[in-house]
Design a protein with these regions (language model features):
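Internal, conserved structured core segments that host functional sites
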Residues: 90-149, 154-160
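N-terminal glycine-/serine-/threonine-rich phosphate-binding loop
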Residues: 1-53
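Active-site rim beta-loop-alpha module in soluble metabolic enzymes
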Residues: 144-150, 154-206
């Protein structure tokens, strides 16, 4: 059995806001590494649960920003980690294919414009507003095109609510209640890790009964986002049309600033 673990950092217990990369103070450096540690521990809980559920292979995708956030020296040595930045359109979920039995998501956050949610961003607009997707549910849809069910996620209460609505049966582990863009009422990290472990086991056990999240084409896709994680939202590019969500996503991403033609000397830790 193969399990794919998609990760982000904004949804981990204890995270409320980013460090200031323009200020190399002790507090900012410590904050960044503290968030890395919190993310690593939650990912380790998910990895252990996957192997305890009978997984033969577990892929961990370090998907936040630089792709260099998880302290991989501290990960369970049985898993493999996908990290770094490919600067191309089709590498957001590398190594996710139809051979994967289930996808798990750790550290998820709400879409842009969601009231009272932690650092909300990335609001994917489908068919001119008929549906909106977060990064989390976009990952579910891309996996769905491959026939892979998304069985579990962790994050704040707002992203858990969206995932439950769109993916019936998914196990949603709320590790914090978001109070505003930069404030939360969080579980203590050790408790969050315990619940993530239990949630991953429960989700994997349900993998045959949770249907892949599939969006029927043809589709029109655009991305709305904002500065500083607060409204107003603005369209980030030109609307694309395609037969599947995967094709639409790849076409849109190919037009954005982090693709190869737009970057000469990339700073891997700067986004985009």
């Amino acid at each position: 059995m193969k399990i794919y673990i998609q990760t982000d950092i904004e949804g981990v217990a204890g995270f409320c806001f980013f460090e200031n990369r323009t200020n190399p103070s002790y507090e900012n450096i410590q904050h960044r590494h503290r968030m890395y540690k919190l993310l690593t521990d939650e990912v380790n809980a998910a990895v252990k649960a996957a192997f305890d559920s009978g997984a033969d292979e577990v892929f961990v995708n370090d998907s936040h920003g630089s792709g260099y956030n998880i302290l991989f020296e501290e990960l369970d040595p049985r898993c493999r980690i996908i990290h770094g930045r490919g600067f191309s359109a089709n590498i957001w979920l590398p190594k996710l294919d139809s051979s994967i039995d289930a996808m798990v998501m750790v550290g998820m956050h709400a879409m842009g414009g969601t009231p009272n949610s932690i650092t909300p961003h990335s609001r994917w607009e489908v068919n001119d507003g008929q549906m909106f997707l977060s990064e989390c549910t976009m990952a579910c849809a891309l996996a769905g095109d491959l026939g892979v069910p998304a069985v579990m996620l962790s994050g704040d209460d707002k992203i858990c609510a969206e995932a439950r609505e769109k993916v019936p049966g998914i196990v949603a582990v709320e590790v914090k209640e978001a109070l505003s863009a930069y404030q939360a009422c969080s579980l203590i990290p050790s408790r969050a890790c315990q619940l993530i472990y239990e949630g991953v086991k429960q989700g994997i056990a349900r993998r045959h009964s949770i249907k892949p999240f599939v969006l029927q084409g043809p589709l029109r896709l655009n991305l709305l986002d904002s500065k500083g994680h607060v409204p107003p939202l603005e369209r980030m590019g030109n609307t694309v049309e395609a037969k599947t969500i995967t094709e639409a996503f790849d076409r849109f991403e190919a037009s954005m600033a982090w693709t190869p033609g737009a970057i000469e000397l990339p700073d891997g830790f700067q986004f985009p």
